[in-house]
Amino acid sequence: MDFSQFNGAEQAHMSKVIEKKQMQDFMRLYSGLVEKCFNACAQDFTSKALTTNETTCVQNCTDKFLKHSERVGARFAEHNAEQMQGAGQ
């Protein structure tokens, strides 16, 4: 995003707003991951420790989620690049 038309104070404010929004998005993503993997993997509530199966499930769940997020991010970047090329022509 181009903030060059704003003065220094406005640029700083916009940067803080964007940073706050990014942190909120990250926390929402993290909370969703925790909830999804907990609901899918936590089965035995008789112990504080995770079972071997639960540990494996959590690892697989987080790996799958992160790979999916990476793929979505890559597709978004590709789409953004196409949009920028289309706007430049």
UniProtKB/Swiss-Prot annotation:
The keyword Disulfide bond applies. It holds the Pfam family zf-Tim10_DDP. The keyword Signal does not apply. GO terms for molecular function: metal ion binding; protein transporter activity; unfolded protein binding. Its main location: mitochondrion. GO terms for cellular component: mitochondrial intermembrane space protein transporter complex; TIM22 mitochondrial import inner membrane insertion complex. Disulfide bonds join C37-C61, C41-C57. It is found in: Mitochondrion inner membrane. It comes from the Eukaryota. A motif (Twin CX3C motif) lies at residues 37-61. InterPro entries: Mito_inner_translocase_sub (IPR050673), Tim10-like (IPR004217), Tim10-like_dom_sf (IPR035427). Keywords: Chaperone, Disulfide bond, Membrane, Metal-binding, Mitochondrion, Mitochondrion inner membrane, Protein transport, Translocation, Transport, Zinc. One of its GO terms (biological process) is protein insertion into mitochondrial inner membrane. Mitochondrial intermembrane chaperone that participates in the import and insertion of multi-pass transmembrane proteins into the mitochondrial inner membrane. Also required for the transfer of beta-barrel precursors from the TOM complex to the sorting and assembly machinery (SAM complex) of the outer membrane. Acts as a chaperone-like protein that protects the hydrophobic precursors from aggregation and guide them through the mitochondrial intermembrane space. The twin CX3C motif contains 4 conserved Cys residues that form 2 disulfide bonds in the mitochondrial intermembrane space. However, during the transit of TIM9 from cytoplasm into mitochondrion, the Cys residues probably coordinate zinc, thereby preventing folding and allowing its transfer across mitochondrial outer membrane. Belongs to the small Tim family. This is Mitochondrial import inner membrane translocase subunit TIM9.
